[in-house]
UniProtKB/Swiss-Prot annotation:
One of the GO biological process terms: defense response
Main location as per UniProt: other
Protein name: Major latex protein 146
Role played: Not known; MLPs constitute up to 50% of the soluble latex protein.
Organism of derivation: Papaver somniferum
The entry's keywords: Cytoplasmic vesicle, Vacuole
Family: Belongs to the MLP family.
Compartment(s) of residence: Vacuole; Cytoplasmic vesicle
A single Gene Ontology CC term: cytoplasmic vesicle
Matching InterPro entries: Bet_v_I/MLP, MLP-like, START-like_dom_sf
Residues making up the signal peptide according to the UniProt record: none
Amino acid sequence: MAHTHCISGLVGKLVMESEVNCNADKYYKLYKHHEDLPSVIPHIYTSVKAVEGHGTTSGCVKEWGYILEGKPLSCKEKTTYNDETRTIHHMVVAGDLMNDYKKFDATLVVNPKSNGHGCIVKWTIDYEKMNEDSPVPFGYLACYQQITEDLSSHLCASD
């Protein structure tokens, strides 16, 4: 697991990369077809629904209920997909995150390992804090790490 941090004043980028022992396409598809996530990892996702567009089409808007550091939260985000590169980009447009951030984008990229066994899961958070008192979103990076591990365990168990 590798972490990278680039923080300058109110703007920052956090990156988390992790090797997992499951197929890249399966991992990407489970996250893209998001409806199952609350049943697979209910300790993180409490709900998800598409509120504009179809949930697996670029440009759709989804509402997520989730738990972060023991607190129930929600957000609305616009999602784009690139199936060729196994990339999902979430741009938060409303919800609890907007209390601390002017901008909060989370990007998931899933790449197969060169040896053909497993994949590399990379989460990148690009953010702009609302003000100096807003926290650096390390809690979200830890949450994405937990999601990565839990989805990998779920997929490995179902293989």
